[in-house]
């Protein structure tokens, strides 16, 4: 039920993103405003992640997830009202994203308890595949729904997915008490103290920092998704093509996750993170040639194939964190992921108001490739240092 509820929520999220991108670009014709509103589906996590993710370590995780789903369903239902002004849509979007932080943290913290040991790694692979599959379906179908039904109806469908997710979690997931940390005694730390403690844990471990850096590479590979509407418009295509452009990378990511989970031994996955991280960004350089929609879709699919490195990085990161603080630490990591995605899309939208969207996508690919090369070196250095401290050969 945890898996199915997550698929429903994610599917609804992608429907909403396509609907909002089409709605804003249709009203304004502005790549900057489209990027700004799309970025609002990521940026509030800068606050919500650090301060609200700790709720997943202080409250029963199932109850927290159900409450967040119901609240998000209500917020998105209001967004679906026809003719809602853009400022109201933006404000409601911020509220919905803030509620995503504790939900995501609770889900990530709960999964290793439901499926411990090696089953967690397999579950991570399945989740990665199904999450990307839900993105493909959500983006591809979302473009068609937005074109046929309109943005308001598409947002209404999104609200229904949150309610369905809440029902599945309440009826199909066993209750578990809130986790406890022996170091904290019977009391609970404040949200600020919890966030600071999680930050210190990450900051004090070079390997965790390097793994987190890999996770944050998505800030470069997400740029084509955020610029899909102006990119399609620059190529003379319509709303249906927007959905295809958004779906291309998740399609490649599904294939990459299947190949990595099925044919690569666990010990080799970490060694492949670097090359795959480079692959997630380097193909975007080809967009500088403005090769047309079909070749662009192929380049984006190859980029998505490379993002399979996130599977190994996520499993290694979560398993290295104590269970009692897993929600907070994962929330901090997720906040960073969402924040860099939103900031990258916002910056890309601003630049795309002056340059061709294809050139902006290519620039993101070049910067991401350089960052991936740096992370290969950083993780290798952290692992050598850890081996030396343990008295093992480097």
Predicted regions and their residues:
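Alpha-helical transmembrane-bundle signature of multi-pass membrane transport and export proteins
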Residues: 1-394
């Amino acid at each position: 039920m945890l898996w199915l509820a997550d698929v429903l929520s994610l599917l609804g999220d992608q429907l909403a993103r396509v609907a909002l991108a089409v709605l804003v670009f249709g009203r304004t014709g502005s790549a900057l405003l489209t990027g700004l509103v799309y970025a609002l589906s990521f940026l509030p996590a800068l606050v919500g992640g650090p301060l609200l993710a700790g709720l997943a370590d202080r409250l029963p995780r199932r109850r927290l997830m159900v409450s967040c789903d119901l609240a998000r369903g209500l917020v998105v239902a209001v967004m679906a009202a026809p003719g809602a002004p853009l400022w109201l849509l933006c404000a409601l979007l911020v509220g919905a994203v803030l509620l995503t932080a504790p939900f995501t943290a609770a889900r990530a913290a709960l999964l290793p308890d439901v499926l411990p040991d090696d089953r967690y790694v397999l579950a991570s692979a399945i989740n990665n595949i199904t999450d990307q599959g839900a993105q493909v379906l959500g983006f591809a179908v979302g473009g068609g729904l937005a074109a046929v039904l309109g943005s308001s109806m598409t947002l209404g469908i999104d609200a229904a997915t949150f309610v369905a997710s809440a029902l599945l979690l309440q009826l199909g997931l066993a209750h578990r008490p809130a986790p406890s940390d022996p170091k904290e005694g019977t009391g609970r730390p404040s949200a600020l103290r919890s966030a600071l403690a999680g930050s210190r844990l990450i900051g004090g471990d070079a390997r965790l920092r390097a793994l987190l850096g890999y996770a944050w590479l998505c800030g470069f590979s997400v740029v084509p998704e955020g610029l899909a509407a102006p990119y399609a418009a620059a190529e003379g295509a319509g709303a249906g093509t927007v959905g295809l452009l958004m779906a291309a990378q998740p399609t490649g990511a599904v294939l990459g996750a299947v190949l990595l989970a099925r044919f690569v031994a666990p010990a080799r996955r970490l060694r492949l993170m670097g090359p795959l991280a480079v692959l997630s960004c380097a193909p975007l350089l080809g967009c500088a040639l403005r090769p047309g929609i079909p070749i662009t879709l192929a380049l984006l699919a190859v980029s998505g194939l490379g993002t399979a490195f996130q599977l190994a990085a996520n499993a290694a990161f979560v398993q290295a964190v104590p269970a009692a603080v897993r929600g907070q630490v994962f929330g901090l990591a997720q906040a960073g992921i969402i924040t860099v995605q939103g900031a990258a899309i916002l910056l890309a939208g601003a630049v795309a108001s002056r340059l061709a969207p294809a050139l902006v996508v290519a620039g993101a690919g070049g910067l991401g490739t350089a960052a991936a090369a740096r992370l290969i070196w950083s993780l290798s250095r952290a692992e050598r240092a850890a081996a030396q401290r343990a008295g093992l050969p480097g």
